[in-house]
């Protein structure tokens, strides 16, 4: 650490390298914070979480009870032990509350004055944060599993919506209507995600075992249907390609948008090149997944080696994205975890579970001390630690 600081001060090292190394160290030290609670409001399981990208201060949660809660994550009391309080909530007595389970909540990417929610009640709602009133409501014929707004687009205000039907619907917030329908899947759409790199690139995952990449400006169908065998097993038409051997119920782009992670009920996670659709063949081992709906997982941002956090039963498994190595299992929930979200400013993780709790995972403030009867040599250290701190640190 001192070597990095000295090199940065003298201009020998790029400041970004120090930041990435420290971010990596903090992610590797994530543990359940016993001094921080998140106020318990939900009477049912937590299905979805989202932290606004403007300040990284406010978090939305949506539950199986139809309730939406807005939390302030900042420690305004400056005390070591504190509770993240609910600023407001859309409870059962609210006139516009969702009638059934809320499956997805998302902040408007450019402003905290608006957020969206979708539910099993077949609606997508657009909310005014200040008044907690609906600004618009989109009604669908089928149950809504997932929706997503582009985190980078300044050219369109399209919300991609996945429902129990096989069609992906694009809702335009400007016009207040469904402007596009993407056809190609054969069963329900369990997850949708816009690329964080390109305005018009959308990924969709379905119960038909397929993942498709779309350029929504094109009228001629999808760009690519991902093939787990990279075209080697069969030279059949692209429509026969499958990404998993079960339902695909989770999607997540890496922060740079160059790769796409998918999870399926075949207990596998796969990493894809998002530009050509190639399966990178990274082996993550068994990733337990028996969810019958969308699984919300997340990736780190700004680390030397990026990490992916995946709900795994009542735990959260942490893997190195590009090597597939399992770093740790975060244990603290009593029931199945359905969602997690990463706070990149402070390298924190928040998770929601069917035990009705939201837990905060924060970097430990101390170095782990080995047992007296153990000797830890450099060769025994986790390779991710070696990536985080270079030899120049030891010399400093």
UniProtKB/Swiss-Prot annotation:
The modification Phosphoserine is found at residues 390-392. GO terms for molecular function: ubiquitin-like ligase-substrate adaptor activity. Its main location: nucleus. Residues 371-396 are annotated as: Disordered. It is found in: Nucleus; Chromosome; Nucleus matrix. PROSITE patterns: WD_REPEATS_1, WD_REPEATS_2, WD_REPEATS_REGION. Keywords: Chromosome, Cockayne syndrome, Deafness, Disease variant, DNA damage, DNA repair, Dwarfism, Nucleus, Phosphoprotein, Repeat, Ubl conjugation pathway, WD repeat. Part of the CSA complex (also named DCX(ERCC8) complex), a DCX E3 ubiquitin-protein ligase complex containing ERCC8, RBX1, DDB1 and CUL4A; the CSA complex interacts with RNA polymerase II; upon UV irradiation it interacts with the COP9 signalosome and preferentially with the hyperphosphorylated form of RNA polymerase II. Interacts with ERCC6/CSB (via CIM motif); promoting recruitment to lesion-stalled RNA polymerase II (Pol II). Interacts with KIAA1530/UVSSA. Interacts with a subunit of RNA polymerase II TFIIH. This is DNA excision repair protein ERCC-8.
